[in-house]
Regions:
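Flexible loop and strand-edge segments within Gram-negative outer membrane beta-barrel domains
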Residues: 247-249, 279-281, 289-313, 317-324, ...
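Aromatic-anchored glycine-rich loop motif in surface-exposed flexible loops
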Residues: 450-460, 514-528
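Short, solvent-exposed loop/turn and secondary-structure capping segments
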Residues: 104-105, 117-118, 359, 449-452, ...
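Residue-level preference for non-acidic, small/hydrophobic
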Residues: 238, 310, 423, 484, ...
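Flexible glycine-rich, low-complexity coil/linker segments exposed to the extracellular/periplasmic environment
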Residues: 253-282, 373-406, 479, 483-485, ...
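Charge-patterned, long linear interaction tracts outside catalytic cores
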Residues: 412-441
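Short, small/polar-rich motifs associated with maturation and membrane association
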Residues: 1-339, 344-351, 420-421
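Extended hydrophobic secondary-structure segments that form protein cores and membrane-embedded regions
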Residues: 180, 239, 347-351, 437-445, ...
Length: 542
């Protein structure tokens, strides 16, 4: 009887573990009315970035899924569908057409189309579908929302992200997608100078259609961003966001007492080097962050016929590493008047941003795991700016240095001014309303100033102490394009012909000062000698 009870308990435990274990979900997605497979359907674990697309036969395989997860199926022109994962990990999903989505206008390259007429792999994300919360950089609005688009970031406040569409994998060339904002291709994928609150929609071009429109620049896909425009109704909106950040978990390392014990057992000759403090270096280099954002926007018509939107953003973002910070001030303007019964339309967009950020060396987290927990953060008698440092006969060693001192004494800042804008004019010919002539001109200009400073009291492994350096860079991107677009329906046949010309120029320059300190002012009293200092983690084998 006892053996039977134990066996029953074992079966129940096994069932429980299986229920919560991650599984692989397989299935097929079909069109409900015809039963035909649907290729390119986005399959996403809701609330995560774990997603795939169906293949040409409508099949998909999605790993790391557990019971209770919700799978979100999305396809242009079809109603979204959610499926809750239970015990069945082999799915047969039917999607039905949505007349509302079929008529939705999406931006593709130099023009627009409806979902039902789109032929390439295009995915459109509007404001209602974007990621919510305290979003600092624009690309995070679509993080986890588009299958095949992978966005990773370093975690530093305001840091740029690495964006990959369908896993670009060139060894030598860039794998970054092309970013187009209101018709203007911009340089790089750094979007931290854009106010996320200004963005109205994203269109992601994933296949050869991107190359057909933008040439080799679109080889890694294209992300088209459309910003919010003015309207006839007057409105004034204010949005305030505050966010609190904390890193709850810590790496389990020896505290001061355990460290003294292990040194006494393994390195008794080094006992005299230990201190009397009990310092948790992880707590010292990590901080609880408070971040705030202010967004003010005004909409309405100027002079009764120019729909206008003006927005201002102020962001102060703290990082969770000591000294890490990101500040941004942003102003954007959009004007969209029309004339001659909407035959002539003008769209003007302009964005201006000031960014000031201080970088914190993330490597000091590793230093916090290795540094001696028996030593204090500060030492009033220390010649190194009042911070404790390991010395032997007055000499700083080549081992790990005080991570708090490294963060506070080394100040690396970056100040950037960026402005970009675009003017587009569309004219629908009166004598041939099926044809529209368009011309646009835009620019993207960036000026960056980076500085590095550390005092003479910073320990060094060379005979050069301290740092005072500066680097500047400037870039200018200019773009002009003109198109003629003819659209007409002949019965069931729709004709859409586009011809155009595009001109783009890039200019960049930069300079760096190197260390500007006078070599004769360098102190050499504390030159280093090679000594290895080790902080043993608890996983160190006994």
């Amino acid at each position: 009887m006892k053996k039977f009870k134990l066996l029953l308990i074992g079966i129940l435990l096994s069932s429980t573990f299986t229920m919560f274990a991650q599984q692989t979900v397989k299935g097929i997605v079909k069109e409900q009315s015809s039963g035909e497979p649907l290729p390119g359907v986005s399959v996403l674990v809701k609330g995560t970035s774990n997603g795939v697309q169906t293949d040409f036969d409508g099949n998909f395989t999605l790993e790391k899924v557990k019971a209770g997860d919700i799978l979100l199926f999305q396809y242009l022109g079809y109603a979204d569908k959610e499926v809750v994962i239970g015990t069945n990990f082999n799915l047969n999903v039917l999607l039905s057409e949505s007349s509302e989505q079929l008529d939705e206008i999406i931006v593709v390259g130099y023009g627009t189309t409806t979902v039902k007429d789109a032929t390439g792999s295009v995915e459109s994300i509007t404001a209602k579908d974007m990621t919510k919360g305290n979003i600092v950089t624009a690309e995070n609005l679509i993080s986890g929302r588009v299958a095949g688009v992978n966005i990773t970031t370093s975690g530093a406040p305001g840091s740029g992200s690495q964006i990959r569409i369908r896993g670009g994998s060139s060894l030598n060339a860039s794998n970054d997608p092309l970013i187009v904002i209101d018709g203007l291709p911009i340089q790089g994928v750094d979007l931290n100078s854009i106010n996320p609150n200004d963005i109205d929609s994203f269109s992601v071009l994933k296949d050869a259609s991107a190359t057909a429109i933008y040439g080799s620049r679109g080889a890694n896909g294209v992300i088209i961003i459309t910003t919010k425009k003015g309207r006839s109704e007057y409105s004034l909106d204010y949005d305030y966001q505050v966010a609190f950040g904390e890193i709850k978990d810590r790496i389990n390392v020896f505290d001061a007492n355990a460290f003294r014990d292990i040194i006494g057992q393994r390195r008794p000759s080094d006992i005299g080097l230990l201190g009397n403090a009990n310092t948790n270096w992880q707590d010292e280099v990590l901080q609880n962050s408070v971040s705030t954002q202010h967004n003010i926007s005004a909409r309405g018509e100027i002079f009764g016929f120019i729909p206008t939107r003006l927005s201002v953003n102020f962001s102060e973002i703290e990082g969770n590493i000591l000294t890490s910070e990101f500040d941004r001030a942003n102003v954007s303007l959009a004007m969209s008047p029309s004339f001659f019964d909407d035959h002539l339309k003008v769209n003007l967009t302009y964005n201006r941003a000031f960014v000031n950020e201080r970088y914190a060396d993330a490597g000091q987290i590793n230093a916090a795991l290795r540094y001696d927990p028996t030593q204090p953060v500060y030492d009033a008698s220390s010649p190194f700016g009042g911070f404790y440092q390991h010395t032997v006969n007055g000499v700083v060693q080549n081992g790990t240095q005080n991570p708090v001192a490294s963060l506070l004494q080394n100040e690396n800042r970056n100040n950037r001014f960026r402005q970009f804008g675009n003017l587009k004019i569309d004219y629908k010919l009166h004598f041939l309303p099926e044809m529209t002539a368009s011309i646009s001109a835009g620019f993207d200009k960036s000026e960056t100033n980076g500085t590095g400073f550390s005092p003479l009291t910073v320990p060094s492994t060379t005979n050069v102490f301290g740092n005072d350096s500066e680097g500047t860079s400037e870039s200018l991107n200019e773009n002009i394009n003109a198109t003629l677009n003819y659209v007409n329906n002949f019965g069931k046949l729709k004709t859409d012909i586009l011809v155009g010309y595009d001109y783009q120029s890039f200019e960049s320059s930069g300079k760096s000062s190197g260390n500007r300190r006078d070599p004769n002012s360098f102190a050499t009293t504390f030159a280093s000698t090679p000594v290895v200092l080790v902080h043993f983690p608890k996983s160190w084998p006994h």
